[in-house]
């Protein structure tokens, strides 16, 4: 059980923790520079992502521990904190997309069309891969039947687009 916990500790804190914060900071910075996101919203979401990483990153690890005999209440707590990790980047992507649609007719926006689409796609894939597909495979009953099936790589690979881009 200690080896399983240690393995998922590394995976969770590196992949789901650091990458989420990094992607949120980079997207927020670029969207602020392109005037698609105001600084206050960017700052709040980056701080929210950092707080979730620091406080919930450790607790979020518990959703990986199904086969090590962890009680269901602990796994549910971990799944809840893990699900919160996608919220800041999704909020940034949503606000940037909304502002992009409002300012889409301006000339400078046309020059940045594809980078903007890429960053918005990052937020979308993060929501779909880490959020939706991750939450589908996290409940204990789902882990009992689906662990190791194609739903696990589906979650991992779609979440990968949500960090590294499309």
Predicted features, each with a name:
Residues 2-10, 144-154:
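Juxtamembrane membrane-water interface segments that cap and precede transmembrane helices
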Residues 1, 11-34, 44-64, 78-100, ...:
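Hydrophobic cores of alpha-helical transmembrane segments in multi-pass integral membrane proteins
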Residues 102-112:
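Membrane-interfacial, low-structure loops and terminal tails that flank and connect transmembrane helices
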Residues 39:
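Solvent-exposed interhelical
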Residues 64-74:
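Membrane-interface helix caps and helix-loop-helix hairpins in membrane proteins
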Residues 7, 33, 68-69, 146, ...:
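Intrinsically disordered, low-complexity regions enriched in small/polar residues
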Residues 9, 76-79, 104, 144-146:
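Active-site-adjacent structural elements in folded domains
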